[in-house]
Amino acid sequence: MVQSAVTHFRPVMILAGGTGGHIFPGLAVAGVLRARGVPVVWLGAAGKMETHLVPKHGIEIQTIAVSGVRGHGMLALLGAPVRVLPAIFAAMRVLRRYRPRVVVSFGGFAAGPGGIAARLMGLPLIVHEQNRAPGMTNRVLARVARRVLSGFPGSFVAEEVVGNPVRKDIAALPAPGVRFAGRSGPVRLLVLGGSQGARVMNNALPVVLRVLSDSDVAVEVRHQCGEALRAETEGAYAYAGVAARVEPFISDMAAAYSWADLVVCRAGASTLAELCAAGVGSVLIPFPAAVDDHQRRNAEYLVAAGAALLLQQQDRAFYVYLESVLRDLLSNPMRRLAMAEAARGLAKSDAAECIAEIILKESI
């Protein structure tokens, strides 16, 4: 049931949108707050993902007309003040209506105008940055925020590292040593291309696994590829003569991580938080076009801890390196266990609860 705009308790207002990487952490924290009886209202950008996703969780959402300026050329940057000012005024109207006790930015198009409006109105502002390379919006808002929270160390000079929220069923998985104990049969390789798929993985994994079929190690493959690339991925495995379970989407990620001995995936902040919470080693292939190369920065944190290996898809020898890395890891259960335990050691599985506590402490 969607919450009413009129409530005895002043709500927490969440600013987040544009991508799942901003929205899902906000939803996780909203869930904790609502479980404690705290009303939540969302401010998003009109026509973006959040307008469809947030109401499905029973949370009221208000929208403002705003869009990004990065990557749209110099004219867009020069015209940014003209475009942003109306959005700030629109955000102020929403804030006056709801009178939130605190405003929390997880990033995205609406977060900039919403955060600036909050500070102009004297409302407490909290920023949570998911990536090691902060987005433009949170970089600006961090200068005026009351509290600056981060998912990884090194996002800001003055920060509180609280981690990125993950689903409770993933955080509740047994430790790697328990899961892997007595495991026999083929090595279980989980490939995650994301909801849109990752063509480089869809093309490379079948070829590399075909080459590795001459080894003594049997491999069982589960490959999540996105709906649009399903037929292409199935064809690539069939052409390579490699058996694989190809899926457009995996609904039970906790079960998938529990099943896996090793994961090959991108390096988005939420995915890495899940890898750590589950405790599973990984081969990370950052999306090279990610803004500010933030996926590579994210991946380097896990690599430094011994929890992952990093490969760059733009490297000319990418296929060779991928084959070498997989040949080593698939044949070395002790190294896989060490990586999994290192990942688990980085986990901050109570991130959503920690963020909610900070929000309540800063409420007015």
Curated annotation (Swiss-Prot):
The EC number of this protein is 2.4.1.227
Species assigned in the record:
Xylella fastidiosa (strain Temecula1 / ATCC 700964)
Q: How does it sit in the membrane?
A: Peripheral membrane protein
Q: What is this protein's function?
A: Cell wall formation. Catalyzes the transfer of a GlcNAc subunit on undecaprenyl-pyrophosphoryl-MurNAc-pentapeptide (lipid intermediate I) to form undecaprenyl-pyrophosphoryl-MurNAc-(pentapeptide)GlcNAc (lipid intermediate II).
Q: What are the UniProt keywords, alphabetically?
A: Cell cycle, Cell division, Cell inner membrane, Cell membrane, Cell shape, Cell wall biogenesis/degradation, Glycosyltransferase, Membrane, Peptidoglycan synthesis, Transferase
Kindly list the GO molecular function terms attached to this UniProt entry.
UDP-N-acetyl-D-glucosamine:N-acetylmuramoyl-L-alanyl-D-glutamyl-meso-2,6-diaminopimelyl-D-alanyl-D-alanine-diphosphoundecaprenol 4-beta-N-acetylglucosaminlytransferase activity; undecaprenyldiphospho-muramoylpentapeptide beta-N-acetylglucosaminyltransferase activity
Q: In which pathway does it act?
A: Cell wall biogenesis; peptidoglycan biosynthesis
This chain belongs to which protein, by name? UDP-N-acetylglucosamine--N-acetylmuramyl-(pentapeptide) pyrophosphoryl-undecaprenol N-acetylglucosamine transferase
Disulfide pairings: none
Classification via SUPFAM superfamilies: UDP-Glycosyltransferase/glycogen phosphorylase (SSF53756)
